[in-house]
Structures are given as C-alpha cells and as structure tokens.
Curated annotation (Swiss-Prot):
It is an enzyme of class 2 (transferase). PROSITE patterns: MTTASE_N (PS51449), MTTASE_RADICAL (PS01278), RADICAL_SAM (PS51918), TRAM (PS50926). [4Fe-4S] cluster 2 binds at residues 146, 150, 153. Its main location: cytoplasm. Belongs to the methylthiotransferase family. RimO subfamily. Its EC number is 2.8.4.4. The keyword S-adenosyl-L-methionine applies. Its cofactor is [4Fe-4S] cluster. One of its GO terms (cellular component) is cytosol. Keywords: 4Fe-4S, Cytoplasm, Iron, Iron-sulfur, Metal-binding, S-adenosyl-L-methionine, Transferase. This is Ribosomal protein uS12 methylthiotransferase RimO. InterPro entries: Elp3/MiaA/NifB-like_rSAM (IPR006638), Methylthiotransferase (IPR005839), Methylthiotransferase_CS (IPR020612), Methylthiotransferase_N (IPR013848), Methylthiotransferase_N_sf (IPR038135), NA-bd_OB-fold (IPR012340), Ribosomal_uS12_MeSTrfase_RimO (IPR005840), rSAM (IPR007197). [4Fe-4S] cluster 1 binds at residues 13, 51, 85. It comes from Bacteroides thetaiotaomicron (strain ATCC 29148 / DSM 2079 / JCM 5827 / CCUG 10774 / NCTC 10582 / VPI-5482 / E50).
Length: 436
C-alpha cells in the first residue's frame, strides 16, 4: 500500500529544525512518507514550521503559508497545517486571515497535529528524531524560552520563560543520536548559560557539557547562543580539559557602548564585556569567538556607533554577524522608545561594521595558511569536498575546500589537512591523512 506523503517546511532557526525533526519521526512512525524542505512539494499534506522573530522572518513565513494555501485552493494539496513561533504569537489573527489552513498550532502543542490526523503521539520516541542534517552532525536543544528582558527581543513573548530539559533526557538523546551515526553536536538554546537554574537551582552548563563529552562516540561539541552576564566560568576549565569540546563559543554581545547596553537592558557593561573576552582567550588558548552585534537600536548616537566600530577592531572576532534593529511589537523598545533612526542610516552602519569585520576575517584566514588542522567532510560540491574545522559551525561559518581531483574522501569522516590558501571567508587545503 502506498504511504501518504507529508511535506515539512522549516523556517527560522535551528531550534525550530529540532522540532521539525521530532515531528517527522512521529509521522514516520504513524506510517507517512515524510520529506523536508523539498523544492518540489508533492505531498497530500503540508506542515509549515514558522519563524516570528523579526519582520523579515515573519514576512517569509506568511509568504510561504500563502503559497501553500494557493496550492490547496488549486487542488494540489489536501491538508495544510502551520506550527511554530509565528502561529504561537498570532494564532487567532492568522486563522481569520488565512482560512485555507486546516489548523494553526503554537510552538509547543504540535503533538496535537498527530491526533488531528487520527494518529497517536508515541511518548517512547521522545528522544528520537529524523535528522535533516548530514548524518554526522545534529543540533542538540537543551532548553526552551528565555528569562532575559532585552529591550528589542520578542523571543520571551513568543516562547515564554526559560525551561531546561533534564540532564538525563539530554544525555539519553545524545546516546541515541550517537547510535544513529552522529559524531558532532551543536548545543543550542535561546540562552545556554542559564541552563539548569530552573531545575537544579544553579547554572549547570559546565557539568552538562562535561557529561556529554564523556559519552563514547561524541567527537565534537560546539556551543551556541551564550549570554555574557553571569557567565559560568567553570566552563573554561571544561573547554580547556576536554578535547572533544570545540574551542568555539557563540556569544551574542549586541553592543559595547554603556549607553546602548543600558538602553538594550543587557545587564552587562562595557568593562564586563572586555573582561569576559580577555578571560576567554586567557583561559581557553586558541578559542574562536563568534558574536552578533546590532546597529540602529533607538538611542544609538554616532558616538555609540564609533565606539562599536572601535570594539570590533580591538576584539578581532573570529566570526561575527550583525543586523539592523527592527521594531517588534510588544517589546520594551517598541513600547518605550521611538524608532527614530532612518533605515538608510541603519543600513549604512551595518555595511560599515561588516566591512571592518571582512578585513579582519581576511587577515585571520590568511594567517592560517601553512597550518595543519583537523576537518570533518560535510559534502561534495562541484569540484570540491567541503569540510569544517572545530572552529566552524554549519551554515554560518567559513568552510574548508579540498579539490576533488586529489583524493577520494568520505563524507562524515575526519581528516588532517594543511591549509594552502585563503580568501576573505573560506580556506583551501590539501589532505595529509585520515583519522582512524
């Protein structure tokens, strides 16, 4: 008997992706054939997992829903369901505006979708997922929500307060994923450093990472989305002592000006920030720091922006992203501040900041020529094998390109390489040997 096909479309962040992967596993158990983010959706049923973080993400989600609603009207789709952050925030409004959708779910009640299809949610599969990533790496979500009160951020409004997963559940999930061939774990949360405070009454991230690192088969652990205030400094020891904890930290700093940090309600100062960066580099030699910065938040003066540029020049981040402020309804900034900085000024500041970082990135990449590094091969693309070092997270960071013609390599395997060339972003390398 031919199985019914369901198309899952995931928009937004890697935390959303984990939810989609859990749903896919449940749907497969229920007897469906499931595809993810296909360019040619042909299923009888579609599920769109939406993002509602900023204006562009909301627009993308709405356009995707409308595209599938049109397919349904044309008879190419029998059922259409929507879940995720956008529908968590605007469920009633969306249901009125887009009646072609059979049902909208929030971010946390997607299990009801199975019941609405006449199927059962299998509790015993709670740690299992159908991976959409290459089989050698996976995202590991350790908590939901956020207790921070940053002025510009709608995430706490959408996802609610911080809720940690239990340590044992996380460790069970890691063991399961290792059994499926996963070697590399991107540990993610809206706010990593708060992990455990709700369950264990203290920050437990260092202990969690240490315990994950002890599981046989875990080759790389990479940490994403830390917060600078009240950073759990015992994590430095874990990163220094454990070879399979990557010397990499993704920590969103947003700004450096004390004026802006106060307006953003970041609970951290310029002095605190510089001290934390210095401590990272002293305590964890060789660490690569990724950060995210914001320009154009209400109240940002030219002096504040000059201070931010000087910070980028001094800090010399290994990886950096930046974005322009966009007003999000319901946030403190939207209620208390006037979004008075013109869009063209925001964009000009963003471009200028990224130009500075591009020069820094080019210098840091060029300095790696001649170095030997351990890489994992993600895929083959054109004339190159595409790999990453421990300092590179999938999708967002530089890659290592190795010519296909030189040697046949295995996707998902580790190799020792020598860097032979570099551009502003990526490295080029030759193979020395395979890690057994």
């Amino acid at each position: 008997m031919k199985r019914k096909r369901i198309d899952i479309i995931t928009l937004g962040c890697s935390k959303n992706l984990v939810d989609s992967e859990q749903l896919m596993r449940q749907l497969e158990e229920a007897g469906y054939s499931v595809t993810h983010d296909t360019e040619n959706p042909e299923g009888e049923i579609a599920v769109i997992n939406t993002c509602g973080f900023i204006g562009d993400a909301k627009e993308e989600s709405i356009n995707m829903i409308l595209e599938f609603a049109e397919r349904k009207e044309e008879g190419d789709l029998k059922k259409l369901f929507v879940m995720g952050c956008l529908s968590e925030r605007y469920l009633q409004e969306l249901a009125i505006e887009i009646p072609q959708v059979d049902k909208f779910y929030g971010k946390f009640n997607w299990k009801e979708l199975l019941q609405d299809l006449g199927k059962t949610y299998h509790e015993e599969l709670y740690i299992e997922r159908t991976l959409t990533t290459p089989k050698h790496y996976a995202y590991l979500k350790i908590s939901e929500g956020c207790d921070r009160k940053c002025s510009y951020c709608a995430i706490p409004i959408i996802t609610g307060r911080h809720i940690s997963k239990s340590m044992e559940e996380i460790l069970d999930e890691v063991r399961y994923l290792v059994s499926q061939g996963v070697k590399e774990f991107q540990v993610i949360a809206q706010e990593l450093t708060y992990y455990g405070v709700d369950l264990y009454k203290k920050q437990m991230l260092p202990e969690l990472i240490e315990r994950i690192s002890e599981i046989p088969g875990v080759e790389w652990i990479r940490l994403h989305y830390a917060y600078p205030a009240h950073f759990p400094t015992d994590l430095f020891r874990v990163m220094r002592e454990r070879d399979n904890v990557c010397k990499y930290m993704d920590i969103a700093l947003q700004h450096i000006s004390d004026n802006m940090l106060k307006l953003m309600r970041r609970q951290v100062s310029k002095e605190d920030t510089y001290k934390l960066i210095e401590q990272f580099r002293k305590e964890v030699p060789g660490i690569h720091l990724r950060t995210t910065l914001m320009v154009g938040h209400p109240g940002e003066t030219e002096e504040d922006f000059e201070e931010l540029k000087e910070f980028v020049r001094k800090a010399r981040f290994d990886r950096m992203g930046a974005f322009a402020y966009s007003e999000e309804e319901g946030t403190y900034a939207a209620q208390q501040y006037e979004d008075s900085i013109p869009q063209e000024v925001k964009q000009a500041r963003l471009d200028e900041l990224m130009d500075i970082q591009q020069g820094i990135s080019a210098e840091l990449s060029a300095a790696k020529i001649g170095q030997q590094m351990k890489v994992i091969i993600d895929r083959i693309e054109g004339d190159y094998y595409i790999g990453r070092t421990e300092f590179d997270s999938p999708e967002v960071d530089p890659e290592v390109l190795i010519s296909v013609s030189r040697e046949e390599l295995e996707v998902g395997q580790f190799y020792q390489v020598e860097v032979t060339d570099a551009d502003d972003f990526d490295l080029y390398a030759k193979i020395l040997n395979k890690y057994e």
